[in-house]
Amino acid sequence: MAKTLSKPASGALAPWLGISLIVILFDQLSKIAILKTFAYGAQHALTSFFSLVLVYNRGAAFGFLSTASGWQRWAFTALGIGATLVICFLLRRHGQQRLFSLSLALILGGALGNVIDRLVYGHVIDFLDFHVGGWHFPAFNLADSAITIGAVLLVYDELRRVRGSR
């Protein structure tokens, strides 16, 4: 009897794409609300260490390359689309690995949330602003939070896998 290669079930991909879609929806809805509520640079303090503020980020994380001549919009858009393709491939192959796939789904949703901003507005909309004393963390958004949480879970999953193989 001939062996056949089994294809990953497309159903294994659907739940993870659903999580990514939820991240994108919350991210985009929060940005729309901020755009409708705040003027650029306007700040609303919610606590002594946390404010909402509308800022535009033409670069990457922490404003990296934000003062470049404009090429970064398309470079980071292409990077986000490339990451999307790689993540979808990994989700199809490893959809049964729940923590790994959850981390990728969060990263995917965050990456696409920011890609949408770059395509629609030409920059990423940031609005979550933390500051304590003289220390100030650069403003960020829900997409960035999903990417960060996904990356932390990815590292945790890998450490757990390495420890389990010993």
From Swiss-Prot:
Q: Which reaction does it catalyse?
A: Release of signal peptides from bacterial membrane prolipoproteins. Hydrolyzes -Xaa-Yaa-Zaa-|-(S,diacylglyceryl)Cys-, in which Xaa is hydrophobic (preferably Leu), and Yaa (Ala or Ser) and Zaa (Gly or Ala) have small, neutral side chains
Q: Where is the active site?
A: 126, 144
Q: Which GO terms describe its biological process?
A: proteolysis
Assigned keywords, A-Z: Aspartyl protease, Cell inner membrane, Cell membrane, Hydrolase, Membrane, Protease, Transmembrane, Transmembrane helix
Kindly list the places in or outside the cell where this protein is found, as annotated in its UniProt entry.
Cell inner membrane
Among PROSITE patterns, the record links this protein to: SPASE_II
InterPro entries from the UniProt entry: Peptidase_A8
Does this UniProt record's set of keywords contain Ribosomal protein?
no
Its Enzyme Commission number? Answer: 3.4.23.36
Any single GO CC term annotated in Swiss-Prot or TrEMBL for this entry: plasma membrane
Pathway given in the UniProt record: Protein modification; lipoprotein biosynthesis (signal peptide cleavage)
A molecular function GO annotation: aspartic-type endopeptidase activity
Transmembrane spans:
9-29, 45-65, 71-91, 100-120, 135-155
Primary role: This protein specifically catalyzes the removal of signal peptides from prolipoproteins.
NCBIfam families in the record: lspA
Which HAMAP family did the record assign?
A: LspA (MF_00161)
Query: What family classification does the UniProt entry report for this protein?
Result: Belongs to the peptidase A8 family.
Kindly provide the name given to this protein in its UniProt entry. Lipoprotein signal peptidase
Lineage runs:
Bacteria, Pseudomonadati, Pseudomonadota, Betaproteobacteria, Burkholderiales
